[in-house]
């Protein structure tokens, strides 16, 4: 029974110890772990994720600062339902989030107000499953990571219509206003705030504290200060003034309304800037009473900075106050109430931590770009930042610096799940804190608690709308394990805050040299999203700042560090200007380069260098591709466009009934299955105790410490999924591959099925292929298939459909599930049970009733016949109508499962009986909890025996067991373990770790008991939890067995796709010399123009493998060479390149030319003809135009469009045309008459007027034109 024979593969890789792949789902799992930080004790949590969001929004105080609500900690309880239950019932797999909040009063008048600490329920948060997905309303969804523009400063360049180059610097924050510095055609620099308000840069500089011209010019070291006296002024005659000579004085005047004395600042310009000083200016300057004047320096530097002088010329303000007022007016289009409020507005724009946030990333990027050393905690702009940006921009104008490449991956970062959830929580908490403040202000003098202030709906509504409607929360592609894993590793540049398809140009979509080892250059969709949606490379990781990094080996003096320590992950920025050797450069055993010249890469350049110049080396040749691209053997021989199709089509491969791993693989198939978590894997070393089709039980080995801290038995049971439906209606049907008594190691795969065999990905079937034409049936990529493939179910798949019917309460009364349906024959209801649900095992044909349901009819006046019936049969007859669920026109299959979920509707006596049960449940729980705590205390006493306390504290930092005290049973029993800090109880670090693990395990078990109690209570009082408004929900699962047939789409792994054009009898297929007929005939003309020669390599090697019973791994860019192929074909006794003479199955004669006959791995894709075939008889019509609907889902017709009308006109087929445009379409009267005529066998009536003409006439009448048909 056990097929636990792992596929041993002959590996062609030249690199013998490649780096291990990181966990492929780390992108999702790690991000979510970092968001919740559940494994970290509260006192050690980093200021990150959810904790950070709370910290930013709390404490919350009321307007008078009397009451303060502080945040202490958050925690979550176990989920109410298991993942499977949520999938079955259409629920969300979530955990209750609770926060410990402290409310205290700072006002001495409220002496009666005590400090309150409470646990407050904040609503459910969807919780990530171990597979990296979320279950939302019963469907598995994935939150895709977003690739967006990193916060920071960007320098760009554009060209004006007149040819002038314009430069700009844009500062993009995480939150807050955008500010852009840009030059115009007159060489003046402006600052744009939020892309609309424009002001000279110097005005902004004055507003932030560089008040007069002197301060501004000193920043750039542009002017010379001259003390005003005759001697000095005579020396500078002939030089230009760098700043205005201003006479400043204050005037007092009385405000007539208030009687206050107000002083106002007055400025008078004596001599304007850029004026050349002459003799007659000297007296003017001395008379004006100024102390100093500024003149231009005589150095060359000032010509670079001419833009600053030009900008000063345009600057309307002369002092900080004027600048502030000017900016305020620009922003608000109104005058400020007073100076302070104007300053406040400017301060809030860039310097307020509440309103502006660069984020850690933004600060890091700005420091890096401008060479600053500002502290990473400063998340707002500083004056220094603004000055340095202006200086850099001026360097740019003078061609002394370069503009940024916006598509460089150091300028783009990834928002993973955790960060997206943090942003949503921040929105929710901000809304909640507003309502908290309002409630605090209202409840001024009464006593209230944190619970009274908080409305849990606020957060959950934001989170639910994110998971339900956000473009990045997607219905998981669950066609096969590869599709799942690829979807979780996908990076999208679309979505909120990202690009839009229409606006994205060519550059953003293109492959960039920084994608090397980070984003796959091959795997991206064809069509409008090309290049905007990409996949993470196999070795890539996302670092704390959200930049994608890739691993390299360190190289020093021509020697590569081949140890595990020699690997370092670098971001695109850190990799700049480094010389990197290729992954397959030959090395000796010590890690030295064998050749004197090494092919290397430096940014976008590929120099050949000497070994001592190399700084880094790729860890593997597979580094540049994603998982899907790495699965294509001989990828190096395929054109990239076809490889793209290949990697996209492997995700559409349908899981087959009989899985078979490829003979020619790439070696990544095993890791993919392990990391996809679709199979059951051993969690540790142990022994299989029991195994059958639905269950595996394993007894795990545990060491003494693990046994001691655990509250769970060592025996673990796993349920094997049977015929489970996936999102795409595929089947997950696993079977065990282990035997009773077998020893297993950690990570061993214990099952197979769902595109998996022997622990490896198995998407298709190894088929014997001949590349030759066959009677024209493989013209244009069509595929000729041997009947054996159909007969032996080689490409057969099972699909499961789920049909749901909900029972609601309507205005006219309750709906009801029943097999007693009015006006339906007994024959039609023979397979229904008493609830009206079809029995398991029934064969379903189109039109059969799956679930019977009746609905109360509307009360209308009964007809005479109905009155008679009611008089005879009582009132019940005829007031319900049939609302059953029937099989759709193309549905044929077998019922494999049915489920019924009901809410409990109870009478008063039943409710009273329940009340008696509930206290018993509580007592049971208390008893179990007490036992559990006793075990904990016993174990803690063992651990703390003879130890002295180092000071056990609760979460507030209060000592509950004093430092230096001995641990006693009484002390340990008195502790509330939910609020105790678990670090440093004793001086023994090992014992501390054990204490932490023990208490954490205890709390987990305690919460599980608590959750179980709640569930039992819920089941008694309410019944099955169902979505709102639904009383019962019936589900029927129907399995369809799909054999491959004409019209189905098949493909190889190299982008070689085609449609099955004919299934040929086995004896008519071309056969080999030994009489073996080939399984599939492909057109050789599909190869040369497509340039995917990899398929030929695969076919040749595959045939050698099949003959010898060997499997191969040929990793991409490091796989089998031509010589290796020849060596293996020789071993197998096959001709070179497998060129073989075939015989015609029909005549038995040998063909003239030899053809390539090999074994290729072929996939059956999810575009099956059975899902697409469709014919309409009589069906629904569109309401207004009265034309038939379109599409299979609506049981619609085929569109006969404008061009088709021309074709019939060209043939002069007037009667057919008239028929098509009237009675077959929208002549309402005509079509019913035609039906009548067909039934009675009479000749067809003449067609009438199409409804579309009436629609047109009505529209014209609506415009006020009186139109009548004569």
From Swiss-Prot:
InterPro entries membership: DNA-dir_RNA_pol_bsu_ext_1_sf, DNA-dir_RNA_pol_bsu_external_1, DNA-dir_RNA_pol_su2, DNA-dir_RNAP_su2_dom, DNA-dir_RNAP_su2_hyb_sf, RNA_pol_bsu_bac, RNA_pol_bsu_CS, RNA_pol_bsu_protrusion
GO annotation terms (biological process): DNA-templated transcription
Listed EC numbers: 2.7.7.6
Root EC class: transferase
PROSITE patterns for this protein: RNA_POL_BETA
Catalysed reaction equations from the record: RNA(n) + a ribonucleoside 5'-triphosphate = RNA(n+1) + diphosphate
GO CC, alphabetical: DNA-directed RNA polymerase complex
Single GO molecular function: DNA-directed RNA polymerase activity
Keyword terms of this UniProt record: DNA-directed RNA polymerase, Nucleotidyltransferase, Transcription, Transferase
Keyword Cell membrane listed: no
Taxonomic superkingdom: Bacteria
Gene3D superfamilies: 2.40.50.100, 2.40.50.150, 3.90.1100.10, DNA-directed RNA polymerase, beta subunit, external 1 domain, DNA-directed RNA polymerase, subunit 2, domain 6, RNA polymerase alpha subunit dimerisation domain, RNA polymerase Rpb2, domain 2
PANTHER family referenced in this protein's UniProt entry, alphabetically: DNA-DIRECTED RNA POLYMERASE I SUBUNIT 2
Self-association state and partner proteins as the record states: The RNAP catalytic core consists of 2 alpha, 1 beta, 1 beta' and 1 omega subunit. When a sigma factor is associated with the core the holoenzyme is formed, which can initiate transcription.
NCBIfam families in alphabetical order: PRK00405.1, rpoB
Purpose: DNA-dependent RNA polymerase catalyzes the transcription of DNA into RNA using the four ribonucleoside triphosphates as substrates.
Family of this protein: Belongs to the RNA polymerase beta chain family.
Protein name: DNA-directed RNA polymerase subunit beta
Organism: Phocaeicola vulgatus (strain ATCC 8482 / DSM 1447 / JCM 5826 / CCUG 4940 / NBRC 14291 / NCTC 11154) (Bacteroides vulgatus)
């Amino acid at each position: 029974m056990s097929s636990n024979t792992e596929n041993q593969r002959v590996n062609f890789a030249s690199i013998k110890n490649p780096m291990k792949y990181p966990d492929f789902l780390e992108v999702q799992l790690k991000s979510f772990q970092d968001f919740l930080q559940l494994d970290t004790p509260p006192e050690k949590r980093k200021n990150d994720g959810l904790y950070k969001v709370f910290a930013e929004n709390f404490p919350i105080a009321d307007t008078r600062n009397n009451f303060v609500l502080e945040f202490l900690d958050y925690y979550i309880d176990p989920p109410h339902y298991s993942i499977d239950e949520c999938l079955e019932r259409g629920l969300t797999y979530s955990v209750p989030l609770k926060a410990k909040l402290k409310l205290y009063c700072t006002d001495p008048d409220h002496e009666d107000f005590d400090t309150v600490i409470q646990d407050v329920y904040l609503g459910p948060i969807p919780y990530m499953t171990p597979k990296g997905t979320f279950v939302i309303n019963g469907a598995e969804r994935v939150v895709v990571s977003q690739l967006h523009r990193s916060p920071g400063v960007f320098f760009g360049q554009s060209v004006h219509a007149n040819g002038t180059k314009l430069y700009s610097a844009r500062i993009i924050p995480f939150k807050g206003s955008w500010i852009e510095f840009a030059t115009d055609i007159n060489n003046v620099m402006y600052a744009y705030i939020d892309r609309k308000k424009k002001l000279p840069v110097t005005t902004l500089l004055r507003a932030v504290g560089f008040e007069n011209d002197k301060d501004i010019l000193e920043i750039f070291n542009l002017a010379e200060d001259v003390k005003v006296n005759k001697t000095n002024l005579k020396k500078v005659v002939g030089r230009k003034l760098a700043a205005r000579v201003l006479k400043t004085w204050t005037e007092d005047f009385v405000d007539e309304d208030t009687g206050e004395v107000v002083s106002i600042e007055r400025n008078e310009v004596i001599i304007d800037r850029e004026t050349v000083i002459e003799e007659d200016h000297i007296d003017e300057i001395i008379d004006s009473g100024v102390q100093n004047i500024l003149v231009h320096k005589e150095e060359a530097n000032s010509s670079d900075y001419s833009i600053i002088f030009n900008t000063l010329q345009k600057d309307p303000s002369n002092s900080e106050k004027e600048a502030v007022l000017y900016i305020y007016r620009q922003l608000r289009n109104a005058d400020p109430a007073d100076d302070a409020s104007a300053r406040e507005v400017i301060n809030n724009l860039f310097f307020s931590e509440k309103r502006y946030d660069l984020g850690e990333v933004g600060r890091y990027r700005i420091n890096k770009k401008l060479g600053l050393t500002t502290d990473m905690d400063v998340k707002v702009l500083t004056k220094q930042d603004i000055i340095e940006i202006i200086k850099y921009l001026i360097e740019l104008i003078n061609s002394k610096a370069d503009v940024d490449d916006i598509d460089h991956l150091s300028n783009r970062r990834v928002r993973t799940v955790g960060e997206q959830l943090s942003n949503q929580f921040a929105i929710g908490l901000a809304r909640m804190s507003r309502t908290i403040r309002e409630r605090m202000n209202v409840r001024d003098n009464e006593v209230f608690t944190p619970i009274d202030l908080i409305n849990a709906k606020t957060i959950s509504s934001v989170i639910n709308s994110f998971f339900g409607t956000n473009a990045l929360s997607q219905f998981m592609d669950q066609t096969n394990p590869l599709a799942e894993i690829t979807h979780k590793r996908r990076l999208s540049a679309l979505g909120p805050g990202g690009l839009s398809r229409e606006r994205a140009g060519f550059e953003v979509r293109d492959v960039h040299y920084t994608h090397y080892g980070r984003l796959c250059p091959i795997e991206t969709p064809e069509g409008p999203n090309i290049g905007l949606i990409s996949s993470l490379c196999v070795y890539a990781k996302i670092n704390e700042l959200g930049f994608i990094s890739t691993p390299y080996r360190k190289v020093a003096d021509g020697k590569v560090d081949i140890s595990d320590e020699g690997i370092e992950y670098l971001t695109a920025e850190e990799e700049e200007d480094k010389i990197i050797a290729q992954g397959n450069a030959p090395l000796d055993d010590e890690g030295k380069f064998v050749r004197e010249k090494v092919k290397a890469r430096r940014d976008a350049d590929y120099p050949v260098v000497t070994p001592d110049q190399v700084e880094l080396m790729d860890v593997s040749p597979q580094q540049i591709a994603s998982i899907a691209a790495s699965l294509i053997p001989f990828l190096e021989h395929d054109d990239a466009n076809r490889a793209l199709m290949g990697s996209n089509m492997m995700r559409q491969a349908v899981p087959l009934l009989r899985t078979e791993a490829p003979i020619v693989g790439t070696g990544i198939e095993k890791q993919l299955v392990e990391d996809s978590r679709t199979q059951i894997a051993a969690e540790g070393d142990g022994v299989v105790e029991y195994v059958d089709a639905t269950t595996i039980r394993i007894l795990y080995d545990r060491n003494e410490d693990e046994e001691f801290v655990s509250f769970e038995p060592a025996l673990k049971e796993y349920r094997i999924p049977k015929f489970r439906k996936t999102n795409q209606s595929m089947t997950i049907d696993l079977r065990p591959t282990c035997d009773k008594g077998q020893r297993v190691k950690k990570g061993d795969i214990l099952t197979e099925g769902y595109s998996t065999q022997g622990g490896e990905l198995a998407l298709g079937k190894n088929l014997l292929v001949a590349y030759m034409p066959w009677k024209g049936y493989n013209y244009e990529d069509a595929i000729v298939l041997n009947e054996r493939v159909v007969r032996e179910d080689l490409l057969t798949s099972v699909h499961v459909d789920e049909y749901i019917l909900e029972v609601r309460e309507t205005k006219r009364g309750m709906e009801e599930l029943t097999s007693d349906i009015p006006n339906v024959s007994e024959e039609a209801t023979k397979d229904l049970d008493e609830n009206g649900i079809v029995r398991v095992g029934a064969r379903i044909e189109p039109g059969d009733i799956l679930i019977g349901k009746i609905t109360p009819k509307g009360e209308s006046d009964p007809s005479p016949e109905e009155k008679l019936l009611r008089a005879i049969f009582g009132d019940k007859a005829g007031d319900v109508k049939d609302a059953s669920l029937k099989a759709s026109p193309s549905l044929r299959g077998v019922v494999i499962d049915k489920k019924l979920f009901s809410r409990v509707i109870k009478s008063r006596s039943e409710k009273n009986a329940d009340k008696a049960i509930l206290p018993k449940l509580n007592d049971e729980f208390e008893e179990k909890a007490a036992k559990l705590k006793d075990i904990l205390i016993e174990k803690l006493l063992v651990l703390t025996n003879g130890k002295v306390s180092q000071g056990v504290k609760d979460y507030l930092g209060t000592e509950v067991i004093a430092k230096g005290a001995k641990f006693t049973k009484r002390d340990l029993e008195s502790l509330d373990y939910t609020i105790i800090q678990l670090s440093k109880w004793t001086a023994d670090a090992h014992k501390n770790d054990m204490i932490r693990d023990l208490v954490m395990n205890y709390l987990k078990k305690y919460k599980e008991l608590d959750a179980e109690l709640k569930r039992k209570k819920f089941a008694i009082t309410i019944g099955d939890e169902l979505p709102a408004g639904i009383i019962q929900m019936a589900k029927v699962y129907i399995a369809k067995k799909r054999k491959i047939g004409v019209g189905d789409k098949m493909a190889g792994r190299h982008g070689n796709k085609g449609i099955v054009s004919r299934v040929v009898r086995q004896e008519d297929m071309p056969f080999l010399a030994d009489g073996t007929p080939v399984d599939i005939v492909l057109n050789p003309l599909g190869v040369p123009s497509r340039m995917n020669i990899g398929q030929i390599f695969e076919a040749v090697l595959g045939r050698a493998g099949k003959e010898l019973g060997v499997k191969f791994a040929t990793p991409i860019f490091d796989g089998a060479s031509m010589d290796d192929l020849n060596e293996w074909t020789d071993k197998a006794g096959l001709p070179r390149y497998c060129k073989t003479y075939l015989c015609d199955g029909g005549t038995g004669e040998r063909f003239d030319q030899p053809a390539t006959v090999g074994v290729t791995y072929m996939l059956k894709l999810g575009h099956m003809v059975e899902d697409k075939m469709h014919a309409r008889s009589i069906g629904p019509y569109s309401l207004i135009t009265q034309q038939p609907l379109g599409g299979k889902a609506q049981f619609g017709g085929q569109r006969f469009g404008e061009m088709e009308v021309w074709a019939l006109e060209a043939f002069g087929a007037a009667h057919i045309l008239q028929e098509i445009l009237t009675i077959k379409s929208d002549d309402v009267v005509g079509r019913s008459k035609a039906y009548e005529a067909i039934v009675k066998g009479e000749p067809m009536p003449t067609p009438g007027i199409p409804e579309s003409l009436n629609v047109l006439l009505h529209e014209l009448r609506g415009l006020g034109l009186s139109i009548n048909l004569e």
